From Swiss-Prot:
The EC number(s) this enzyme carries: 6.5.1.2
Family of the protein in this entry: Belongs to the NAD-dependent DNA ligase family. LigA subfamily.
Organism lineage: Bacteria, Pseudomonadati, Pseudomonadota, Alphaproteobacteria, Hyphomicrobiales
Enzymatic reactions: NAD(+) + (deoxyribonucleotide)n-3'-hydroxyl + 5'-phospho-(deoxyribonucleotide)m = (deoxyribonucleotide)n+m + AMP + beta-nicotinamide D-nucleotide
Protein name: DNA ligase
Source domain of life: Bacteria
Keywords: DNA damage, DNA repair, DNA replication, Ligase, Magnesium, Manganese, Metal-binding, NAD, Zinc
Single GO MF descriptor: DNA ligase (NAD+) activity
Segments forming domain BRCT: 639-717
Keyword Metal-binding: yes
Organism: Rhizobium rhizogenes (strain K84 / ATCC BAA-868)
Role according to the record: DNA ligase that catalyzes the formation of phosphodiester linkages between 5'-phosphoryl and 3'-hydroxyl groups in double-stranded DNA using NAD as a coenzyme and as the energy source for the reaction. It is essential for DNA replication and repair of damaged DNA.
NCBIfam families linked: dnlj, PRK07956.1
Binding residues for NAD(+): 44-48, 93-94, 127, 150, 186, 302, 326
Protein's gene: ligA
Sites where the protein binds Zn(2+): 431, 434, 455, 461
Length: 717
């Protein structure tokens, strides 16, 4: 049994450390998917279980609490699409409770911390926990000045223009409001509006949305505020950030004031004085849940007195005076009608169950996630059997679970109801979007086959195309000034043939297509004559490009900047590189061996590159690209007499005489290999001020450490 599965009380200290490392990474990954990408892969119940296990291990082994522990962190880092906003007061998360006993413990803890006896009554508020996107809206002198998402709790994303389109949120406050007001609450999409939007999408032949929460979050992150306005988003106010003056001295009074200022507040909020009353209201809200026109995943309890809230204070990432009482997962039995495959922006093929409509928790469910091919077969993430090894087949009667109002999932199969004629599901070997090969890679770290099946279509797969284009123009690839994420989205979505950019070659034909078009880019909002002229100049400057940048820009899986340089240096010209990849297609022979023998490449990378070139449409796109650009012959490092040729070098800390990129380029030109991490194979660590764990590791492995000046002296300035 692995450390991730073993009961907490049975863990050794070493196993606990390993489990905490795994949980920190897994929770951070899911935080990014939920808060950053609005695309959760697991249910709230599964996520909460991960966090509870992390907290339990930390409680038993307090000395092992990590710097990156989920118990010290809120949400996920803000995206780079919107400008960052630092919150005047952090937007913290709430601790969760899952049972009546947990709620009783929470209330008892409040009394204990304050030194109150049970007969010294403390009032609490109880309100539905809205399943939406947390928002902080700032007003100064009665006018809205900014709106930001939660982000990581400290820094969020500036979405002011989009928030202004939500009719329920006032643009100005009445004369009696304080000079500085930060209203916090939840942006959400009503169930009725969500169903209407999906009906519209289906009528237009477009893919429907998964659930109201993700749709609301995605709508709010639109670069075009007109799209946000069309989505009919709504808002509930329930908290505050910075306030120059407080209109009330209780939680209940503050929310009442928000309502008087014109903000929507939840009508189910109550002020209660006992655990029994709190739990009764929880049950009452649970009964009303199916009839509400918005998704909720629990009930939030808060100490009502602001004075007592201040005395209770905060833990590292949550207040002591509040908790969220989550609803349990809800299940129902229905028939699996079909399995569809959706392709994500990274090329991942995700199976989606199409179900006979069934009501789960008051909501009609017709789709459910099936995660990946192994999940369908009855195999877990670590190769262990799940559902006692029972596979899932089309036609099966299945148990569907809906936890926390997120995407439902199939948790079990009723074998007794399986028809004798049923057959095991065959996961597709080609991409349903573009027809390219679909493969399961070998994980470099574990050596095992990944659970995720990915499309190898690259450039030509529409599902991946925009992300590939953004990578293509990124700083270490083509680095085209004026062509960022926002512009790529605009060009990709355009229906005008003179403006469309669907593949990399389209970037370089844009100016020619515009010359013969009546619809000029310079006349479109956000561009203008000067910026368009600069954009064309920036594109034309990149027609000649270093070979390693060209290879990196192709977006081949596992090929990062360093690997691209190794490949460029080994093959010299693009013609030789492409010919070598095609000759290596059988994964055997001299060309395959040559590729595998490049130091720093290895079989996983080699296989990924060869698979990319086995796809005819990738080769076709590259052929068109080569009509427009000229990859330059790779410069071979002048290593004659170099004291660092063949050595592995790591730079850490601050460098004063070079940028990190300049130092790296110089070392590589002298025949050194520059690495981002220290290992026993590292030869030299160049440490500047602020060097941290890499310097410690270098000393641990007895690696030669030198200052920047000593390094310059070694290489001759």
């Amino acid at each position: 049994m692995s450390s991730e599965q073993k009961p907490v009380e049975d863990l050794t200290e070493e196993e606990a450390a390993a489990a905490l490392a795994y949980l920190a990474a897994e929770i951070a990954r899911n935080d990014a998917l939920y808060h950053g990408n609005d695309a959760p892969e697991i249910s709230d119940a599964e996520y909460d279980a991960l966090k509870r296990r992390n907290d339990a291990i930390e409680a038993r082994f307090p000395a092992l609490v990590r710097a990156d522990s989920p118990s010290r962190r809120v949400g996920a880092a803000p995206s780079e699409t919107f400008m960052p906003v630092v919150h005047a007061r952090p937007m913290l998360s709430l601790d969760n409770t899952f049972s009546q006993e947990d709620v009783q413990d929470f209330v008892a803890g409040v009394y204990r911390f304050l030194g109150r006896l049970p007969d010294q009554s403390i009032a609490f508020t109880a309100e539905p926990k809205i399943d939406g996107l947390s928002m902080s809206i700032r007003y100064e002198n009665g006018r809205m000045v900014s709106a930001a998402t939660r982000g990581d709790g400290t820094t969020g994303e500036n979405v002011t223009a989009n928030i202004r389109t939500i009719k329920e949120i006032p643009q100005t406050l009445p004369a009696g409001a304080p000079a500085v007001v930060e209203i916090r609450g939840e942006v959400y999409m009503a169930k009725s509006d969500f169903l209407a939007l999906n009906a519209q999408m289906e009528a237009e032949g477009k893919q429907s949305y998964v659930n109201p929460r993700n749709t609301a979050a995605g709508s709010l992150r639109q670069l075009d505020a007109k799209v946000t306005a069309s989505r009919k988003l709504k808002f509930f106010a329930y908290a505050w950030g910075e306030m120059s003056d407080m209109p009330a001295d209780t939680q209940f009074g503050m929310v009442q004031a928000f309502g008087e200022w014109g903000f929507p507040v939840n009508p189910l909020m109550k002020r209660l004085n006992s655990v029994a009353d709190i739990l009764a209201h929880y049950d009452e809200i649970g009964l009303q849940r199916p009839d509400l026109d918005y998704d909720i995943d629990g009930v939030v309890y808060k100490v009502d007195s602001l004075e007592l809230q201040a005395r209770l204070g905060f833990r590292s990432r949550s207040p002591r005076w509040a908790t969220a009482h989550k609803f349990p997962a809800e299940q129902a039995l229905t028939r699996l009608l079909d399995i569809d495959i959706q392709v994500g922006r990274t090329g991942a093929l995700t199976p989606v169950a199409r179900l006979e409509p069934i009501t789960v928790g008051g909501v009609v469910v017709t789709n459910a996630t099936l995660h990946n091919a192994d999940y369908i077969k009855g195999i877990g993430n670590k190769g262990e059997p799940i559902r006692d090894g029972r596979d899932i087949r089309i036609g099966d009667m299945v148990i569907v679970q809906r936890a926390g109002d997120v995407i439902p999932q199939i948790v079990d199969v009723v074998l007794e109801k399986r028809e004798a004629s049923s057959v095991a599901y065959e996961f597709p070997k080609t991409c349903p979007v573009c027809g390219s090969h679909a493969v399961r890679d070998i994980n470099e770290k574990t050596g095992k086959v990944d659970a995720v099946t990915r499309c190898t279509g690259g450039f030509i797969c529409r599902a991946q195309a925009t992300e590939h284009l953004k990578h293509f123009v990124s700083r270490n690839a083509y680095d085209i000034e004026g062509l960022g994420s926002k512009q790529i989205d605009f060009f990709f979505e355009s229906d005008d043939p003179a403006l469309q950019v669907r593949t990399a070659p389209d970037i370089f034909t844009l100016e020619r297509r515009q010359q013969s078009s009546l619809s000029k880019l310079e006349n479109i909002d956000g561009f203008g004559k000067v910026s368009v002229s600069k954009l064309y100049a920036a594109i034309n400057e990149r027609r000649d490009i270093a070979l390693h940048r060209f290879i990196f820009a192709l977006g081949i899986r596992h090929v990062g900047e360093t690997t691209a340089k190794l490949l460029a240096r080994s093959y010299g010209t693009y013609e030789a590189f492409e010919a070598g990849m095609k000759e290596a297609a059988p994964l055997a022979g001299d060309a395959w061996n040559d590729l595998n023998n490049i130091e720093g490449v290895g079989e996983v990378v080699a296989r990924a590159v060869v698979e990319f070139y086995k796809e005819p449409r990738n080769v076709e796109v590259i052929s068109k690209l080569l009509d427009e650009v000229r990859p330059q012959e790779a410069e071979q490092p002048t290593t004659s007499g170099s004291p660092v040729v063949g050595k592995t070098v790591v730079f850490t800390g601050s460098l004063e005489k070079f940028t990190r990129d300049e130092a790296k380029a110089k070392a590589e030109s002298l025949g050194a290999k520059v690495s981002g991490s220290v290992s026993k194979k590292t030869d030299i660590v160049v440490a500047g001020p602020g060097a941290g764990s890499k310097l410690d590791k270098a000393r641990e492995f007895n690696v030669q450490v030198m200052t920047e000046d000593e390094w310059l002296e070694l290489i001759g300035g």
